[in-house]
Amino acid sequence: MIRQCLHLTTSPLLLLLLIALSSIGTVVAKSDGPKIASIQLETEPSMPFYFENSDTVLFLRLDTGEVYQSFDGGVEWKVLGKDHETEGETAGLANGAVMIQAHPYDNQKAYILGRHGVHWVTTDQGKTWREFEVPAAPSMFNEPLRFHGEDSGKVIFQGERCSAFACVETSYYTRNNFETVKPMRDTARGCMWAVATPGFADSTTEHAEEIRDRVLCIVHGLKNPFASAYRLVYSDSFFEDDQDGIEAKLNEGRPVAGIINAAARTKYIVAAAKSQGTDELAMFVTDDAITWHRAEFGNHKIEESAYTVLEGTNYSIEVDVMNTDRSTNMGVLFTSNSNGTYFTRNIEHTNRDMSGLVDFEKIAGVQGIVLVNVVDNWEEIENDPKADRKVISKISFDDGRTFQSLKVKDKDLHLHSVTAFENIGRVFSSPAPGIVMGVGNTGTHLKSYTKDGDLYVSDDAGVTWRLALEKPHKYEIGNKGAIIMAIKDNDKPTKKIQYSINHGKDWETAELDREIIPYFLTTTPDSTSLKFMLVGYVEDPADWYIYAIDFEGLHERECKDSDFENWPARLDENGEPDCLMGHKQFYRRRKSDANCFITETMFKTPKPEFKSCKCTAEDFECDYNFVRSEDRKECVPATILKAPEGTCKNDDDTFKGPSGWRLIPGNVCTRDGAVELDKEIDRPCKDALKTPSGDSKAVSSTANYIETEMFGEFFYLERAGSSRGEDETIIMRTTDGKLYVTHDHGKSWTHELKDVKIQQIAPHRYLNDRAFFLTSGKKQYYTINRAESFDAFSAPAEVNPSGLTLGYHEEFKDWMIWTGPGECSHGECPKVSFISKHRGDDWEILLRAVEKCEFMAREDRKDSGSLIFCDQHEGEKVDGQRMLVTSNDFFATSTTPLTNIIDFATMAEFIIIATRNPEKENSLKVDASVNGVEFADAEFPYNLEVPVQLAYTVLDSSTHSVFLHVTANNKMDQSYGSIIKSNSNGTSYVLSLNDVNRNNGGYVDFEKLPGLEGVALANVVSNTKNVEKGSEKKLTSMITHNDGSQWTLIPPPAKDSEGKPYSCGSDGKPTDKCSLHLHGYTERRDPRDSFGSASAIGLLFGVGNVGESLGSKSEASTFFSSDGGISWKEVKKGNYMWKFGDQGSVLVLVEELKPTRDIYFSTDEGDTWEKYQFSEKEVTVQSLSTVPSGTSKNFLIWGKETGSSKLVTINLDFSGLRDRTCNLDEDTGESEDYYLWEPKHPLQEGNCLFGHVEQYHRKKPSSHCWNDWSEAHVHRISHNCTCTEEDYECDYNYERQTDGSCALVPGLLKPNAIDYCRENPEAIEYWEPTGYRRIPLTTCQGGKNLDRWVSRPCPSHEEEYQRKHGPSGAVIFFAIIVPITIAVAAGYWVYTRWDGKFGQIRLGDGGAQSFVTSRGDSPFITIPVAIIAGTVAAVKVLPLLVMSLWRSVTGYVRIPGRRGPRPYATRDAFAARRGDYTHVVDDEDELLGDDEFEDEEGDERN
């Protein structure tokens, strides 16, 4: 309901006077007040806005979807599509709107977005509206409309298309203002135009043709759906020529993963990236959409949701960076140089709020004037965040170089700013030149808005201030400063409005027709109109009122030239016009006492005039690769300068080099007779970059002796891709509890926490910079900055003696779970889990009598932020039956989905729970969940010949399916079992490989190769019948290239490393008598080692032999493959350890546990090997390590000097081998230094693997350069292939035949396919089983359709079935075979293109421990992971560093968890370090299940 009224405020006396004056012919027609009209609404008006330079205003009623429009500033209103039949309107507009958006650069255009794909546009300020359709709803996560900064007809529409399973963000574009609309592409975080602002268009005229149609989009990773893999891609053809686009070269000519946001600011585009394993952001900036640079903030760390890009200028970016804990909300204000690359600190302790808003505003229209609020008592707030903060206001007149107090005469003035703003629009200023207003108080600091606030005004851009009105007011400025309106704002009803026509010196009063509580006051964005709109409500929230207040009648005279002044926008300390950016700025503005209004040119925004100045030092900035010195007086090199070729023959020479200064681009100062800081200067050659020699002599070694008996554990705290710094940090604990730290990869070590004995190191599972150092007492220590400093907290209990002590949260970095022994008077004390949300500052009890509790949060697991799983004893008794207890509210309430459990483990999206089988004595069964809410029994294949399931090992789930090892024999030295593979929700399994080797500790000889989809190696026991009789195992190595669907022997090389043939007569093809066999995971000294590295795709090492079966390690040779295991060659006789450097540019070998002084290295993918002597004395090498990502040029040898007890670490530095970075052309893929390598299957043509062809950059072996890339990178998915038999595997109850087909297991019935309908009531159809199912990883399209031949309608859905597609209709791609809801993060796109590489999990069947690893953007984690058996809980802890002489019962190496990258010691295979890790137990009697079942069997025998 709308009620309208109009009244004119006049006094009777003045009315009589006006009548009398008119009767004698005087031309005076003033009114004594504004005209006021109002309407009443039943709900709050939303999204009000004026068309700039007009009196046309719109707002939206959210409850009805109605759009209200007025052409006279709010006097008369109509509902579009309802009240009037205006040209172009349609009936759907009457109640179909969800938002209104004005075009930011074209004041004629606005858009109304509807609910159901129907939208409207106006190109004439609302006079007419035109309907257009886009088949998507407006995006809820991205800005629905993105505008072009030069051509207002170009608009990107960002929407979402939803299915029953998920919503997909997608973008459309128009080049003619939605006359036509075309789809562009699916996105992750939306798209934007490169030319996104008019300022960008003006500053890039030289690139106009190249970037005119360029679009930038944040899209999913090629193989990973999570934010850590998001990419920034661009296209100049709306992705028509190339569907994926070209990745933007953000960092030194290389793409960057983890793009979380991109935005345009004036003449810049800013992109933020966050790598996995860190909370630190990297910011990248471009001013031409072609060349990008990383923005440098000195030593300040930028975190997600902890920085704010503020309103900048056309020559700099303003960023406020939080520099304290989030609870204190204070920041540092930075200003960039002109290309946005180097930021300098302007002012510290800026006042922020929890949402990231900062008390900062640039004065509109005036260059260089900035208002900020800072926290005066910042030290007190940092010590006590709950203390009252004392905020003070500061102003700068020189672009933030210096700040001073605001003054009312001799008193300091403090104003409420953005964080406490009580209106809409700008806070202090408007386009009205020089008029600045605010609510605040004088005194020592800012006080209460309501109780102490008054309205203050300045008409000289903040130089001087005066009291305008007592008490707080909402205020607006109109007619370019000629009229100021205000209404009291103290949360009390009022009917009085006040206005001033002389810059706030004097005020008049008018009254509304009723008292209201003001909600907001606004006018046209350019502050040119004489009309204002006031919105308020009475105490009943159902009664809202909109007032249109028109001051046009106050004066009738139009301002003349004599009514204007030439006002200088900035004054120096002497009161003279000041220079900035090489000019002085002036405005022609109405004098404050002029008795006139500006009506003829009312809607023209004031424009400044400029006068040039001579260049001074302030007109220069630091050149690229230079930064300000500490005293800000010089520009010093940010990197070592390179001398020109032919110069610097001696260190005493000099060369002509840059001064470090440059004139700020856009600065218009005159150079004649002025300062010239940018002239070249003489620089000393001794400070120039020395070119590496490029030969083997350039390899260096640095030895350090550690005074201890044995190394204990060590971890790399590797910098993630978005982290700043150059360090390569390792933390190491010795067996006597000493902590050593190196920041230069072992070239030097320091002893830290000298008075503390460290029992364990527990690196943070998700953040590389963090690690915790656990002691035997309550006081514990940690670092959050890669061991630069250390802090302490008090633990709620002692360290867990038999399991994981600390658990970490994936999203909330300071949330932790501590599990340790509770207090009791006698006997075994039950364990208690505690939670802290503040990094150990305080603790609360989660649950008592537990084995473990874990956070279950995952980015793709809906509503899992507070989800916690606990393994608890029933009745809180130590000997009580164990049950799975879950909660989403920290156990204020809880559920118990499963009882009588043995353990649970998480692996990528899967949660696997082992429980006792109630139907089979002494046997286990598996339950699975994806969403953490619904659980289902796992269906094992009937041809799985394991009558009593004694233990499980969860091997891998990196390819949308779980590999599970089911133990068939767990007797000492006889263990083996079958590997089965699940469907996409972990509940239905098929047999993959029989008789796979398992050791006494429960670990399995199975390993996925890092970075290669579907490639795995396993060792099988070839003589199981003899083993059952007590014979020694004979192992045979097998390999799969299609994710376990088919296994083959490993092809042997034709000749050995000496060119001799093998005795078994190898011809390069594997046979039962002659194939390659490799020692696997169960024989590794260090469980973090792997065959390959995720950063060196396709490069593999292994130790083994060629023959009929696997021989002894003492007689083994070292083999190498460069094509992902398809072919191999012997590179060395003997047992060598290996590591990969610089993504495979350097391969290093060193002999294991034999005295040596030499290593071998290759720089040509293993074709040739050079020897390097690293020590004069022989060293027995116990381990060889490098950064987990395999991207460093440094390696570290850990060993003992032969013949002595001295422990030594030796750093090997290869950085001097090459003198340049390889040239990469990401656009074309190949270049002089790179070729594109495609993984392939040895038995398939066309390099198709899992339905697509992948391409990776590989450095050419002949190129003498460094990759210098921090992460492995897929160049592109070349194309999807047509489906073949290799894209299918045998379905449940079917098995592979000798001819390769799948047939029903004899004696079994086909699965009852109609069960799917019962389990999924909304399903329309089901498919008759064919014996085949698609491999979850495949993305093939078309071709052979082996899994869906005949579809049937589900009962009660026959009509829908016929309507949908009939017998051959669309496939329900996400079919779920058992009653469990799959948690899908990104819909069909994610399912078909994500390989889910998140590693492997180990639930140990020993000593209540588990072993879990994971890998986010990196392909695979290779450690077999979950072992479950018996009755003792398996808990996630790190496996013991299995190096002889280093093991101890209490020592273990903790490696971080699932999402990484995370720090751990040596395993290249965990390139980005994603994983959970668990304790590898020395005491095998503690193994889960094995000994208990044996005891029971023994009892029966007795």
Curated annotation (Swiss-Prot):
- Repeat (BNR) residue spans along the chain: 68-78, 120-130, 395-404, 456-466, 498-508, 740-750, 1119-1129, 1160-1171
Q: Which SUPFAM superfamilies match?
A: Oligoxyloglucan reducing end-specific cellobiohydrolase (SSF110296)
Q: Does the keyword Transmembrane helix apply?
A: yes
> Which stretches are Lumenal in the membrane topology?
30-1369, 1444-1502
Q: Which GO terms describe its biological process?
A: Golgi to endosome transport; Golgi to vacuole transport; protein targeting to vacuole
Family label: Belongs to the VPS10-related sortilin family.
Protein name, entry field? Vacuolar protein sorting/targeting protein 10
Protein's organism: Talaromyces stipitatus (strain ATCC 10500 / CBS 375.48 / QM 6759 / NRRL 1006) (Penicillium stipitatum)
